[in-house]
From Swiss-Prot:
Residue positions binding Mg(2+): D159
Molecular-function GO terms, alphabetical: guanine phosphoribosyltransferase activity; hypoxanthine phosphoribosyltransferase activity; magnesium ion binding; nucleotide binding
Native species: Dictyostelium discoideum (Social amoeba)
Function: Converts guanine to guanosine monophosphate, and hypoxanthine to inosine monophosphate. Transfers the 5-phosphoribosyl group from 5-phosphoribosylpyrophosphate onto the purine. Plays a central role in the generation of purine nucleotides through the purine salvage pathway.
GO cellular component, as recorded: cytosol
Keywords: Cytoplasm, Glycosyltransferase, Magnesium, Metal-binding, Nucleotide-binding, Purine salvage, Transferase
Name recorded for this polypeptide: Hypoxanthine-guanine phosphoribosyltransferase
One of the GO BP terms on file: hypoxanthine metabolic process
């Protein structure tokens, strides 16, 4: 088989619900919360997470950015490109970055520095997956889904060359799938 399940659909749903409860508690007094999804990989995680956050007295808005450091490779190139920026101001608002995976930490660090210059009231991150062993820089992750080993993960929005995003679980892409 070309992939091995790391986290099942049920495990992911349970963890995302837990994160939603934490975020609901932490932002219950916020007036304006902007959830910034990093495309494309975080779209499934963000969709499920948003439905797990219940803030009836908060103006919750969704924004998206597209940032890339991969291309069609299985490891980060280290070159960060902003392909789509925010469409509205985040000044004075509470901002929560929704990211699929942190490998080296370089992309998230760069993004946090960029958004911090836009003067949000607060800036935090919710990350589905972190490769702790691969971190080159420490980045603050307030809401963590799962720590994972140094393997290439697919499914639940994460891809390899635009394939496998639709899988309902998170799996390891085996080397025979991409090495020729």
């Amino acid at each position: 088989m070309s992939r091995e399940v790391i986290f099942t659909e049920k495990e992911i749903k349970e963890r995302v619900s837990e994160l939603g409860r934490q975020i609901t508690q932490d932002y219950k007094d916020s007036k304006n919360l902007v959830l910034v999804g990093i495309l494309k990989g975080s779209f499934v995680f963000m969709s499920d997470l948003v439905r797990s956050i219940h803030l009836p007295n908060t103006n919750v808005s969704l924004e998206f950015m597209s940032i890339s450091s991969y291309g069609a490779e299985t490891s980060s190139s280290g070159v960060i490109r902003i392909m789509m920026d925010l469409r509205t101001s985040i000044e004075g608002k509470d901002v929560l970055i929704i990211e699929d995976i942190v490998d080296s930490g370089l992309t998230l660090k760069h993004l946090m520095e960029l958004l911090n210059h836009r003067n949000p009231n607060s800036l935090h991150t919710a990350v589905l997956l972190r490769k702790k062993e691969g971190l080159k820089v420490e980045v603050p992750v307030k809401y963590m889904g799962f720590d994972i080993p140094m393997v290439f993960i697919i499914g639940y929005g994460l891809d390899f060359a635009e394939n496998y995003r639709e899988l309902p679980y998170l799996g390891e892409l085996k080397e025979e799938c991409y090495k020729k």
